[in-house]
Amino acid sequence: MRIILVCICAWFVAQVIKVILNTIRFIIDKKKGNVTKKVTIGTLFKLGGMPSSHTATVISLSTCIGALEGFNSNIFAVSGVFAFITMFDAFMVRLPVEKLTEAFIGVREKVEGKDVKPIKKVEGHTIPEIIGGFIVGAGIALLFLKFSPLFPEYVSLFAA
């Protein structure tokens, strides 16, 4: 259960960073006069953007498992494969789907007189966004492992 808490915290921190970065972007765009998106509380639950919260979550999971069970353990191998698939999907699947969705929305907007239902834009991740999520996830996990009373057996491993 304690590893789940670390994962939730990593996800939350990544989402808060997204809100902060989107707010900064909004302020800069507003000053330039080209505001396209608003920042709302709903931004906290949006997919896509910097950093990848999916990556932060799975990397925090893998980091905790590796630290507690051993980096040679079978469960760490499983979590590592799971993390790789998640990051691969974010970049190689969701990003192209985002581009296709944008193209479809553009075509749909040009079709007049047709009853075409709008589709929700799916957002993927760029490599820097995935790396950002990796850093957040590993960082949060290491902070919990070092400083949290949830992991007393691991705190002693940091002692010299």
Where are these regions (language model features)?
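N-terminal signal-anchor transmembrane alpha helix
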Residues: 1-22
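Membrane-interface helix-loop junction between the first two transmembrane segments
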Residues: 16-39
